[in-house]
Structure formats: C-alpha cells, structure tokens
Amino acid sequence: MVNRLILMVVVVFITDSVMGTAEVMSHVTAHFGKALEECREESGLPVEVMDEFKHFWREDFEVVHRELGCAIICMSNKFELLQDDTRIHHVKMHDYIKSFPNGQVLSEKMVQLIHNCEKQYDDIADDCDRVVKVAACFKKDAKKEGIAPEVAMIEAVIEKY
C-alpha cells in the first residue's frame, strides 16, 4: 500500500513537471513566433512556410527550409538572444525564458538542448543552414525530453502576446 502511494506521488510529480515545462514552452513559442511576421520578408521565407510556423511542434511540420533558419536568426536578434557568431547567448536566453510564467523550470533544459544541437552542427559555415539544422535537432530533442508543447497549448496562450 505504501509503495503504491509513493509510486502515485512520483507519477503525479513527474506529470506536473512535464506539463509545467510544456506549458512554459508554449508561452516561449507563442511570444517568439510573434516576431516572425517582421522577419518574413527580410529572410525570404515563403508565406506558406510562415503560415505553417505556428505548427512548428506538430510531427508533420518539417524544419528544413534554409529561409526558416534565416527567419529564426532574425527573430532571435529581435530579442537579442544570439552572440555575434549566431550562436545562443546563454545568459540572455536564460533570462528570456525565465521572463515567462514559471520559466525557471524550463530555462536550464532548453539552453542545454539548444547548445548540444549547436555543437552537432558547428561545422556548417552558412548561418541559416546551420540554424535550421539546430532548430530541427532542438525540436526532436525537446519532444524526446517531453517538453514540447501541444499546438492547442500554444493557441491557448498566443493572444497574450
């Protein structure tokens, strides 16, 4: 009986933790995505790809277009999240994520995942090509870690930004 109770408490804690991080990720995604319209023209991102960006976390959204990498760079620059070499600025990224409700639960993991993906593609010279690969890697790893939000979660908070 005690073992079942302990197991139940652990399951509830893990579920709350995962839901908490996915919920924070929905806020980060919704806010970050607001800069896309400003960056679309500058990056050469086709309108149809831009329209699909709100579905970034869906399984069938392919993170492959070079222009999407350029748009992500532009969007990141709007929030001053990159260093001069277009790699994430760890401190500024932590601060950005922590600025959202309950952001501290996601900050460390998100920066770690992005940094690990950046290391995998560090040899790609073209910034836009590299960033789109990093974004695809981050999406895959975030899903594996259980911190990726459901599209409905993003839609629920998008009006706040």
UniProtKB/Swiss-Prot annotation:
Superkingdom in the source lineage: Eukaryota
Full protein name: General odorant-binding protein 2
Keywords for this protein: Disulfide bond, Olfaction, Sensory transduction, Signal, Transport
Cysteine disulfide partners in this protein: C39-C74, C70-C128, C117-C137
Source organism: Manduca sexta (Tobacco hawkmoth)
Pfam families for the chain: PBP_GOBP (PF01395)
Biological processes per GO annotation: sensory perception of smell
GN (gene name): GOBP2
Signal peptide: 1-20
Expressing tissues: Olfactory tissue; expressed by the glia-like support cells that ensheathe the sensory neurons and line the base of the sensillum lumen.
Function of the molecule: Present in the aqueous fluid surrounding olfactory sensory dendrites and are thought to aid in the capture and transport of hydrophobic odorants into and through this fluid.
GO molecular function terms listed in the Swiss-Prot or TrEMBL record: odorant binding
Entries under InterPro entries matching the protein: Odorant/phero-bd_Lep, PBP/GOBP, PBP_GOBP_sf
Subunit (UniProt): Homodimer.
Family to which this protein belongs: Belongs to the PBP/GOBP family.
SMART domains: PhBP
